[in-house]
């Protein structure tokens, strides 16, 4: 028989497209993937944080801003520094979000493997939007990514979905279309499942 808290979680999770966010108060790692302009920062603020405020987000842009104090400028060692900060943070057992374009596969493998050794649950959330929308939004950001980099990242993300799923084996791999209203999908056993009512089919 379910306890009251288990019953509440089960009922709530039926209506929540990513129930892990609410379920885990500690030791949940989210690898948040998406192009520049896909809306990663907005998704954290609008979707993740309202469901569970116990997350610390790590992004290269944030580290760069700490050093340059100017969002339009990029600090060359930001990516390395971001990974080192996150690597230290996971030893605390607190929830984290690794906000990344997915262009550095080695960093993703490192963080997931280190987290697993410390008992973390890992999920991937990949934000998807059409290339034109991403490029338009990118121009509206404080720091614009080069279009060549956006094209490169777009090709890598689509290629790496099976790589991450097969080799890193996250508990769940979600896809979220952020072009307009959020639409949720799940990548499972090599197939993309659509969300219908309270389940993915």
Each predicted region: which residue ranges?
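Short acidic, low-complexity intrinsically disordered linear motifs used
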Residues: 1-12
